[in-house]
Each structure stands twice: as C-alpha cells, then as structure tokens.
C-alpha cells in the first residue's frame, strides 16, 4: 500500500510541479515581451494549495487573516509550512538562501517572489530593508523568527531583529501557529530538521497516510518605532506557542464561520 501511495502522490507532485514551472515560465515570458510586471501572488496561492493537496494534507484553519498588508510571524517546523501558509493568503516569504539553490523548487521559490537571506552572514540589516520595502509596496511578508525548524512540539525563542521592519513600514504584525498531527499526536515525519535532505524528506512524507495540519491566525498586533520590541517579541512567541498547544490538543475550530475549514488531498 505504501508503494502505491508513494507512486500515486509522487506522480501527482511531479506533474503539478511541471505545470507550475510552465506557468512560471509563461509569466516570465509575458513580462519580458510586454515589459510589464505581473502580480504573481494569486498564481502562487493556487500553486501552494496544489502542492498541499499533492502532499495529502488535511488542513483546518481558525481565525481571520488580515485584509491589509502585515508582517506575519509563525513557528517553523518544515519546508511544507510554506505551501500550507502560502495557500491561505497572498504573501511573500523570507527564506534561507540554501532553498534558492534547490533544483526546480529553488527556481520556483524565486519566481514566487521569495526573499532570500544568508544565515550568519551579518546581512540582517539588508533583509530588514527588503522586508520593509516589500511591506511598503502593499505586500504581506512571512518570517519565521525562531530562525530554524523545530520538531513541532514547542516554539523556540523569537529573534526580534527582523520585526523592526513592521514598524519601519507602518504595518501591523499578525502571529500564526502551525502544527502537524498524525493519529491525534504531533507528527514526527513532518519536521524538517538537522541534516535531513529535501528529496529524502519528501519521499517519507509522500509514503505515509494523510497528516492533519492546523493553522491559527491570531489577532494582529500594532507597533510603532516607540514600541519595546523585546516585550512584543516575547508576547508574540507566547501567542504562537499557545496556539500550537491548542492545535496539538485538537481544539481547532473556525470561529469566524462556526466550523472547521478543511482542504483535503488524495485519500491514499
């Protein structure tokens, strides 16, 4: 059964990846020929949702995403956080530079408008400037303030240096919580940690039955240049942590619509 599931999902994933690459090339060609700039956000959101379906995710969401540009902050468990969260609302990501060098995936991430940062390179100031510029242009940006992925059972302390971009751009911050469950417990396959390689992790994910993914969009937090970011950062981390606990306890419901919202992949 695992072999059938893997073969089916891998075929779907590869086929959808090919369609996504074709779409990205088409948009790039149109921009080049007509010397125009196409908003890729709606296309990226469709593609991210497609990836989540191919991975077999069953998603439930709670809360309302901001209708205005905001700086999203979230806990970070896996590379799959990106298609999950990117499928919820149009946004751009801040990602480590290594992702940009991944075959096909890296190129697609670049075409989707991902902002890449060199870890440990002392270029946080440049990243802050790029985030501020993107927010000021009317686009939301998602950052992972933990600075690394975790096993998904807790939330590490948040780094505050990139959160200054929200104050610089005059936008709010909206915390998000994401969690993966399998059989009612934190999933041990979803975390992308240590020296794991993308292709090996992907195969393991595709081989196993569908995983439940919970996302909580918490109320926005307003800051300005007079705000004590150290306190705000601690509060944001606690909010995200409490949300993760709620997801792990299976107490997720869509308060806005009165029921859970599910996006299911193939039942394999």
What do these predicted regions represent?
Residues 131-132, 138-141, 145-163:
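Soluble extracytoplasmic domains of inner/organellar membrane proteins
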Residues 23-38, 52-54, 67-121:
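Catalytic core of membrane glycerolipid acyltransferases/transacylases, capturing the structured
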Residues 116-118, 218-223, 238-241:
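Polar-ligand-bearing catalytic/cofactor-coordination segments
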Residues 104-106, 153-227, 234-235, 250-257:
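A cross-family acyltransferase "interaction/gating" segment
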Residues 114-135, 140:
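A membrane-cytosol interface segment of integral membrane proteins
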Residues 1-60, 107-111:
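A transmembrane-helix-recognition feature enriched in membrane-embedded lipid enzymes
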Residues 69-71, 138-144, 172, 214:
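Residue-level preference for the first positions of well-ordered beta-strands
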Residues 235, 242-268:
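Cytosolic-facing loops and C-terminal tails of multi-pass membrane proteins
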């Amino acid at each position: 059964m695992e072999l059938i599931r893997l073969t089916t999902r891998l075929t779907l994933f590869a086929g959808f990846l090919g369609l996504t690459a074709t779409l990205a090339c088409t948009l790039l060609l149109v921009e080049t020929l007509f010397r125009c700039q196409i908003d890729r956000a709606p296309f990226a959101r469709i593609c991210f949702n497609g990836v989540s379906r191919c991975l077999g995710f069953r998603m439930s969401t709670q809360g309302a995403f901001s209708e205005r540009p905001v700086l999203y902050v979230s806990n970070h468990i896996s590379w799959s956080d990106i298609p999950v969260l990117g499928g919820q609302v149009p946004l751009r990501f801040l990602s480590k530079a290594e992702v940009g060098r991944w075959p096909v995936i890296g190129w697609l991430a670049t075409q989707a408008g991902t902002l890449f940062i060199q870890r440990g390179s002392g270029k946080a100031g440049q990243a802050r400037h790029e985030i501020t510029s993107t927010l000021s242009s009317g686009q939301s940006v998602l950052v992972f303030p933990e600075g690394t992925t975790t096993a998904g059972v807790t939330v590490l302390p948040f780094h505050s240096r990139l959160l200054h971009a929200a104050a610089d751009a005059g936008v709010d911050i909206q915390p998000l919580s994401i969690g993966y469950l399998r059989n009612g417990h934190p999933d041990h396959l979803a975390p992308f940690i240590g020296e794991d390689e993308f292709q090996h992790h992907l195969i393991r994910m595709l081989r196993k039955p569908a995983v439940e993914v919970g996302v909580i969009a918490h109320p926005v937090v307003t800051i300005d240049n007079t705000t004590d970011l150290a306190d705000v950062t601690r509060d944001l981390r606690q909010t995200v942590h409490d949300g993760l606990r709620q997801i792990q306890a299976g107490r997720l419901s869509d308060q806005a619509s009165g029921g859970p919202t599910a996006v299911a992949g193939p039942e394999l």
